């Protein structure tokens, strides 16, 4: 009897030690993608940073840091049921802060994409912005929303709310812009991003997400074998500095992606637009603009069988094929070296340089109005 009691006590002591190291301190459990929350605990510009983990009922997982509102990882099953990380990024806050312009997974604003010559005129007043890309303003400048700390509140296991007050004059933009972004990991394995914003002075707004996707599940691979479809009859051609010059049909050009094509098939075609972009880096004008229920784009990896569908209520979609990813390689999560064209971005948006091109849909937001936008990245297999 004494031996039995002793055995039970020993077992209880052993179980009570689970989750602790040799010194008795609680050990940290990694996320599905191998991230450690402690690697994101810091302070930037005097504000705390952290990693937030979203999980749905099917076992999928998405991780977001409030520095830049960045989507750090998305774990979804491949055709064999293996959980696979489909976005690029870093595994600690220090790397993100050291490399802000890579924009991995970042929220982008106040104006996503380019504004020509870093200036625009609104209601008779000219506003000068940072010129951080060939004399133009790209993604709100070097200190855009991708490089600030957002206030974060985890609503439930599947939902994260981020808020940020972009002050009047920040990066040259007029008006105090009060922004709310909701990340939700739905039970059908979709990352649903909803944006809201209000202003106290007329301004321009174009918010988006700059996640880099590679669906293959092969660390360090390119996306040249992925297939892509974009439901768009027209697109914005650009000049040598990637400023739109108008609207043209995709028919008869390598920009025709209305039926699925292999990304690498025409990416190095001497077609002038692909030469200017160094590959695909253009805005497609969506046929179902404003309809969140229609598939705007579809990407498939033949290796993993993972499918990503994009839904949005925005009129445009920027397809960027990782042309500027360094050929020398960037070391990302778990030490993986990211190659040239190691991922693609699908950024839902209004057209680039709209503040200077009155024929494009308006991006002006005035007091009393509410800016709303939504982007859904939905994952499945085939």
Outline where the language-model segments fall:
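An exposed, glycine/acidic-rich loop-and-rim segment of catalytic or binding clefts
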Residues: 18-60, 66-382
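C-terminal motif of bacterial Sec signal peptides marking the signal peptidase cleavage site
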Residues: 13-16
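Sec-dependent signal peptide hydrophobic core
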Residues: 5-10
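Positively charged n-region of N-terminal signal peptides that target proteins for export
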Residues: 1-4, 19
